[in-house]
Amino acid sequence: MPEYVNWLRHASPYINAHRDCTFVVMLPGDGVEHPNFGNIVHDLVLLHSLGVRLVLVHGSRPQIEVRLEARGLTPTYHEGMRITDAATLECVIDAVGHLRIAIEARLSMDMASSPMQGSRLRVTSGNFVTARPIGVLEGVDYHHTGEVRRVDRKGINRLLDERSIVLLSPLGYSPTGEIFNLACEDVATRAAIDLGADKLLLFGADLGLIDENGRLVRELRPQQVPAHLQRLGSSNYQAELLDAAAEACRGGVGRSHIVSYAEDGALLTELFTRDGGGTLVAQEQFELVREAAIEDVGGLLDLISPLEEQGILVRRSREVLEREIEQFSVVEREGMIIACAALYQIADSDAGELACLAVNPEYRHGARGDVLLERIQTRARAQGLKTLFVLTTRTAHWFRERGFVPSSVDRLPSARASLYNYQRNSKIFEKAL
């Protein structure tokens, strides 16, 4: 089977889920200048064609720096924010205006020689952002640097209903006609919150949030963000993106994502695959450990059948699983059962058997087996069981490392010993609870 067929089948639930959803996408000025910008535009057009309501927010920092240098002006910052005097504001307006027009032109192109050839869409920009001055902080006058006061929710939603892509620039206007230089991260975050967006997507140079060991952090909850901000420091752009992502979630946005503008296809990978390719920040749990329900039988069969074929697990038919479903605990991720374990109380004894412990091969890098083991042990104690047995042919060392000790058929309660399969010759371990 062609690989794209399998990919499309796996992506189809996400295509349906994203249709008619509102996504706010923030692309910094560095991302617009990057060679991958053309691919990002193609991907945005694809999202639009799939029914996603798109608000695109662009930055302009490097473009402003170029204009300041051309005029012999020195950029001035305080606490990471640009101080925008009158001369700097002229550079800001020039940079933002040119960039907005360039982005509109790119989105207006016929996507010749691309999957989106023939796509026609409308891009709309305007005075959707009302701003106010930051003013004087710690004795420093920020002049024309401002912050978002409100976003024209009704006006933007009306355009989204009409199938326009709304383009927001990092400029805001006051009711008295003043112009303020804004941070694109602030514009995107406030737009996502005020619009009640389903997602805020933030582009950065890296794949996402990188931890102290150089590894990608794939998932975070807002409560975990402060520790990373402290590690990164206030001058780190990753910290700015992470702070914006967490603020959006606290403001009611369903999910925030940090992805790379340098990685071709990063946006689509993040949105249409189960594990994504960037960093996800969300209030809800990404994985749920729970007791199994009858609706999980199909997912359990998908999980354990390959292990049964290899002789690692004892075969269980659909009928058996349906009958014994209440014995199972599962780990669910994005609607997919990725791990399971079962607890059987052994008749006429105070012992139980841990059985059918299985983890999807793609998710064995985590501690999901340990999580399920703890879950089963907690259930066993709640049932008043004193001993937990396990029979295994392949994972003896794993259980020994977790406190199980070698046992024998003679140690099994008679109700279980009479069912022991000598041909399978499983090793027996037990653990006092």
From Swiss-Prot:
Catalytic activity: L-glutamate + acetyl-CoA = N-acetyl-L-glutamate + CoA + H(+)
Record's protein name: Amino-acid acetyltransferase
Gene Ontology terms: cellular component: cytoplasm
Protein EC: 2.3.1.1
NCBIfam families named in the record: N-Ac-Glu-synth, PRK05279.1
N-acetyltransferase domain span: 287-426
Entries under HAMAP family matching the protein: N_acetyl_glu_synth
Protein's UniProt keywords contain Transcription: no
Pathway: Amino-acid biosynthesis; L-arginine biosynthesis; N(2)-acetyl-L-ornithine from L-glutamate: step 1/4
Matching SUPFAM superfamilies: Acyl-CoA N-acyltransferases (Nat) (SSF55729), Carbamate kinase-like (SSF53633)
Similarity comment: family membership: Belongs to the acetyltransferase family. ArgA subfamily.
Principal localisation: cytoplasm
GO MF annotation: an example: L-glutamate N-acetyltransferase activity
Main enzyme class: transferase
Entry's localization field: Cytoplasm
Record-level GO BP terms: L-arginine biosynthetic process
Xref: InterPro entries: AceGlu_kinase-like_sf, Acyl_CoA_acyltransferase, Asp/Glu/Uridylate_kinase, GNAT_dom, NAGS_kin, NH2A_AcTrfase
Keyword Metal-binding recorded: no
Superkingdom assignment: Bacteria
Keywords for the protein's UniProt record, in alphabetical order: Acyltransferase, Amino-acid biosynthesis, Arginine biosynthesis, Cytoplasm, Transferase
